[in-house]
Amino acid sequence: MVPQTRYARSGKVHIAYQVTGEGPLDLVFVPGWVSHVELSWEEPTYASFLRRLASFSRLITFDKRGTGLSDRVPDDQLPTLEERMDDLRAVMDAVDSQRAAVFGVSEGGNLSMLFAATYPARTVALVTAGSFAKRV
């Protein structure tokens, strides 16, 4: 079953998000460059991955601004990492998550690192996959 999609406000932009699972840990999954919270559940392997994460946590997923079901942005105003970090914070606020483990994949890992450094009190743990802190 696909979780209900809701929207958080981040500045003037609406950010699509979903919450599934009832575990004791809030886990925010930060996707890579492209995502779609509803279509993710249609790909069997990816859906299995999300279900596994939700089996031990309250899993919070979202589409970054300009992707998936979140509001579009003009091509000449692509979002900065800081704006996308604010989107992550807005989603956490919308679901009343005071502290969460943040799991970022690819570009989502860079975003997760920035969030953890900016909001250490709101970050229980940081997990990254396929990410880098500095391009060399």
Q: What function would you assign to each model-found segment?
A:
Residues 1-6:
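Short, hydrophobic/aromatic-rich segments at coil-to-beta transitions
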Residues 71-85:
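Catalytic nucleophile-loop/oxyanion-hole region of alpha/beta-hydrolase
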Residues 42-45, 74-77, 116-117:
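Short, glycine/charged-enriched secondary-structure capping and boundary segments
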Residues 7-71:
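Conserved HGGG/HGGXW glycine-rich cap/lid loop of the alpha/beta-hydrolase fold
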Residues 82-100:
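Conserved acidic catalytic loop of the alpha/beta-hydrolase fold
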Residues 47, 51, 89, 113:
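Active-site phosphate/pyrophosphate- and oxyanion-stabilizing loops and adjacent acidic/basic residues
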Residues 98-136:
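Conserved hydrolase catalytic core segment
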